[in-house]
Curated annotation (Swiss-Prot):
Pathway: Amino-acid biosynthesis; D-alanine biosynthesis; D-alanine from L-alanine: step 1/1. Belongs to the alanine racemase family. It comes from Rickettsia rickettsii (strain Sheila Smith). It holds the Pfam family Ala_racemase_C. HAMAP family: Ala_racemase (MF_01201). Its cofactor is pyridoxal 5'-phosphate. It catalyses: L-alanine = D-alanine. The keyword Cell division does not apply. This is Alanine racemase. Catalyzes the interconversion of L-alanine and D-alanine. May also act on other amino acids. The lineage of its organism: Bacteria, Pseudomonadati, Pseudomonadota, Alphaproteobacteria, Rickettsiales.
Length: 355
């Protein structure tokens, strides 16, 4: 078992959810738990959020949906964002998973299985309003408006769309997408709607509709919510190096003084990016400690020379992620986003759930 521990505070995630619910007022709030709950544990997080009356959980694939259904039972809604395909349609039906249909081909597939089972099948429709990833195009939406038989056999529960730049509150593209979405919804007056992701929740009530779908904000990746994640690693080796000693592969760091160097048992095999080589930091007792040398597969080195001697010992824990080094702060060092930091948390880490 790994010597490193990821601690996930479920109470913090629940409090983040309640904050979002308070902002959304009368709209329902679901939860994006795709990619194993952004690397933190979809099942554990979903069970915690069910305690706060969350009933809509969004996953990426049928496989993720099946795993969640097996763990949570039948009384919640599990939505599959990537939609339905010929190979997994029967699995979606068997496990009561609701696909988000992204194009006319997926609608056709779901209709086919509706006819096969001789019953209505639930679905969401995804309208592309400008992010241009998934979603029915304007031409496809027009076909649906003009020919309602295209939805025959389907229990259309929600129409959704996704915002491209919701984290920029003043970006006019948000309003463009909102207006496109509203224009489409006029043709489906009795269908519930969902637009707001985490950032969209804070754009105002016009974006909330019937259901919000936060992911990042639940996991502390929004400035108004709290980080629930701590990653700690113990010092497993200490050495005293003289001036001009080289550290790590390819000798990319050379000591500029006599130095005390500590080694921690994590590396790029654990999702700790090589881009942190010679520029990342960890914290020991609230003090910043620089990463020196290359990040290797299983190990990193840190320079603890400036710490008090009483704080330098084998087994001393360094905080890799936590209150001093949040996922967003870490991500900014290497030009990525907090989402990537969390979803890259390695499977070798021991997971500990509190709260």
């Amino acid at each position: 078992m790994s010597l490193c521990t990821v601690e996930i505070n479920l109470s913090t995630i629940k409090n983040n959810y309640l904050l979002l619910q308070d902002v959304c007022k009368t709209s329902l709030v679901g939860a994006a738990v795709k990619a194993n709950g952004y690397g933190l544990g979809a099942i554990q997080i979903s069970k915690a959020l069910i305690e706060e009356n969350c009933r809509h959980f969004f996953v990426a694939s049928s496989e993720e949906g099946v795993n969640l259904r097996n763990a949570l039972g039948l009384d919640i809604n599990i939505l599959v964002l990537n939609g339905v395909f010929e190979h997994d349609a029967l699995e979606l039906i068997e496990y009561n998973l609701t696909p988000v249909l992204n194009n006319l081909k997926q609608i056709e597939i779901w209709q086919k299985f509706s006819n096969l089972k001789n019953r209505l099948l639930p679905c969401y429709l995804h309208f592309n309003t400008g992010i241009n990833r998934l979603g029915l195009s304007s031409d496809e939406i027009e076909q649906l408006i003009n020919d309602r038989d295209l939805l025959k056999g389907l229990d259309l529960q929600y129409i959704i769309s996704h915002l491209a730049i919701s984290e920029e509150i003043d970006n006019p593209y948000n309003l463009e997408q909102l207006n496109r979405f509203k224009a489409y919804l006029q043709y489906f007056p009795n269908v519930k709607a969902s637009l707001a992701n985490s950032g969209g929740i804070f754009l105002g009530q016009d974006y909330h509709f019937d259901l919000a779908r936060p992911g990042a904000a639940l996991y502390g990746l929004n400035p108004l919510t709290k980080n629930p994640v701590t990653l700690k690693a113990p010092i497993i080796h200490l050495q005293n190096l003289t001036l001009d000693s080289h550290i790590g592969y390819n000798m990319t760091f050379t000591t500029k003084r006599d130095s005390v160097i500590a080694t921690l048992p994590l590396g790029y095999a654990d999702g700790f990016s090589r881009n942190f080589s010679n520029q990342g930091e960890v914290f020991i007792n609230s003090r910043s400690v620089p990463i020196v040398g290359r990040v290797s597969m299983d190990l990193i080195n840190i320079d603890v020379t400036d710490l008090p001697p009483s704080e330098i010992f084998l087994g001393q824990e360094a905080e890799i992620i936590g209150n001093y080094c949040t996922p967003n702060k870490i991500a900014s060092i290497i030009g990525t986003i907090g989402y990537e930091v969390l979803t890259n948390l390695g499977s070798r880490y021991k997971r500990k759930y509190i709260g």
